[in-house]
């Protein structure tokens, strides 16, 4: 039996701010239980729902040094979906109204968490063969493991993997502060270790000291070795390219299933979508005050409204796009200027554009089901889960060829009759517009071709079991079997 510990700052269903929670919470249950004992460790935030906190059972507590402090470390545990979750408790660090705050407070909080992850292992009597760390919040786990923990035989031979979900977030602050917070010696603050451009960098420490580095799609693994996508760490990632690989994320096919989804007004599957899918569109048009036209092409957008997601392109061509016979439904929150942009177009083209400036899981499912196409023109996209959800619901993605979007959406080829969506390659508003208009043409003039594409999209398998097989293979390679 191989023991694997996921160290993460968030995991569904306990706490979620982004895609990292989906990976850490959903992936573990898809491993082969005969060969892998997967457990997850995360902080016990005060902002978790009370129903989860009530189910956690206290294991023990102890005190641990961190820099110049002596910190309380409480351990709680519970089982969910057959997976054991451990929670690190410390009210000083984890009592805020949300999981993340601002540097340097977050850095101290996750330096504490990284050290606590290692400190609790002998206490809970679980010795992992591999500690799988996720994003900068756990970047110091491989560093601490390499440092003082080597004095204890228990930790000898434990391997670490660093998974980068988004390279943009690295956990950076000045060296003096990080040295004080972490209690690490000067040895670690050189340009070949934790120092990057005169600052201390948590993620860099993780990448340098981990035994293997992964990211969440093949294309993104290649892209981050270039200056444009590398966020200042491209040189290091090129140096580590032998142990860097991309494994595409999946989605939970039980949660996202148009045949059983309770949020939909009409459920459907790959054989019934031609008749049933449109009923969701009619209902959504009614509920959102759009013109009720079952034949109108509806384009869905469900996203954080930020620069990364390509909303400057959408802003640029929105007036032109609204001259076409399309309807646009957007759901999400984010930068104020993009929120206001969608509010403006909702007002200007009322009946064609609907801006839902909030986030609601049930509404997102309804948009995936009701839309004909799903727009996702990201500037960069490590993996992206929305396009996988839209494929699952038979809604064809229109994407920019970057990161996970390039790996998961096969562009339509009308001569070969292949493809599961539409794509464009340059970050250019009119290139995006012409791709949308090409999709409109297929939708209105070649409906049979469109439906065949929906068939292919719904037949794709991006469930977690696919990703789990690739992770298992990597664990075996790292353990040496």
Give the residues covered by each predicted segment:
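Catalytic cores of nucleotide-sugar-dependent glycosyltransferases that transfer UDP/GDP/TDP-activated
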Residues: 1-481
């Amino acid at each position: 039996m191989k023991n694997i510990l996921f160290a993460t700052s968030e995991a569904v269903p306990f706490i979620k701010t982004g895609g990292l929670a989906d990976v850490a919470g959903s992936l573990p249950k898809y491993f082969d239980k005969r060969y892998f004992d997967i457990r997850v460790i995360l902080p016990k935030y005060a902002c978790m729902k009370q129903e989860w906190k009530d189910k956690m059972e206290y294991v023990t507590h102890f005190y641990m040094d961190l820099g110049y402090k002596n910190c309380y470390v409480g351990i709680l545990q519970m089982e969910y979906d057959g997976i054991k979750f451990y929670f690190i408790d410390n009210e000083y660090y984890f009592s805020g109204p949300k999981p993340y705050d601002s540097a340097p407070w977050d850095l101290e909080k996750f330096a504490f968490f990284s050290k606590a992850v290692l400190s609790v292992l002998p206490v809970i009597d679980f010795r992992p063969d591999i500690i799988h760390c996720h994003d900068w919040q756990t970047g110091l786990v491989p560093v601490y493991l390499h440092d003082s923990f080597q004095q204890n035989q228990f930790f000898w031979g434990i391997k670490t993997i660093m998974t980068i979900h988004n390279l943009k977030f690295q956990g950076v602050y000045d060296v003096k502060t990080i040295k004080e917070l972490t209690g690490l010696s000067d040895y670690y603050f050189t340009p070949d270790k934790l120092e990057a451009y005169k600052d201390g960098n948590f993620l860099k420490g993780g990448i340098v000291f981990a035994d293997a580095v992964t990211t969440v799609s093949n294309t993104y693994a290649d892209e981050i070795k270039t200056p444009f996508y590398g966020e200042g760490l491209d040189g290091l990632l090129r140096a580590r390219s032998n142990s860097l690989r991309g494994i595409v994320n999946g989605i939970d096919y039980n949660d996202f299933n148009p045949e059983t989804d309770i949020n939909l007004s009409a459920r459907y599957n790959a054989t019934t979508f031609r008749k049933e899918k449109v009923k969701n569109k009619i209902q959504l048009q009614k509920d959102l005050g759009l013109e009720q036209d079952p034949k109108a092409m509806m384009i869905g957008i469900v996203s954080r409204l930020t620069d990364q997601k390509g909303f400057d392109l959408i802003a640029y061509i929105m007036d032109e796009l609204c001259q076409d016979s399309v309807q646009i439904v957007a759901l999400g929150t984010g930068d104020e200027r993009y929120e206001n942009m969608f509010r403006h177009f909702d007002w200007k083209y009322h009946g064609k554009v609907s801006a839902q400036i909030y986030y609601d899981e049930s509404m997102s499912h309804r948009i995936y089901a009701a839309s004909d196409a799903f727009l996702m023109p990201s500037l960069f996209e490590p993996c992206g889960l929305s396009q996988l959800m839209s494929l699952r619901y038979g809604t064809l993605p229109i994407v920019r060829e970057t990161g996970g979007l390039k790996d998961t959406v096969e562009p339509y080829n009308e001569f070969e009759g292949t493809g599961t969506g539409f794509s464009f390659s340059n970050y250019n508003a009119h290139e995006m517009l012409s791709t949308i208009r090409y999709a409109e043409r297929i939708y209105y003039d070649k409906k049979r071709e469109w439906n065949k594409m929906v068939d292919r999209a719904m037949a794709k398998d991006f469930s977690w079991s696919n990703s789990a097989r690739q992770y298992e293979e990597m664990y075996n390679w790292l353990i040496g079997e």
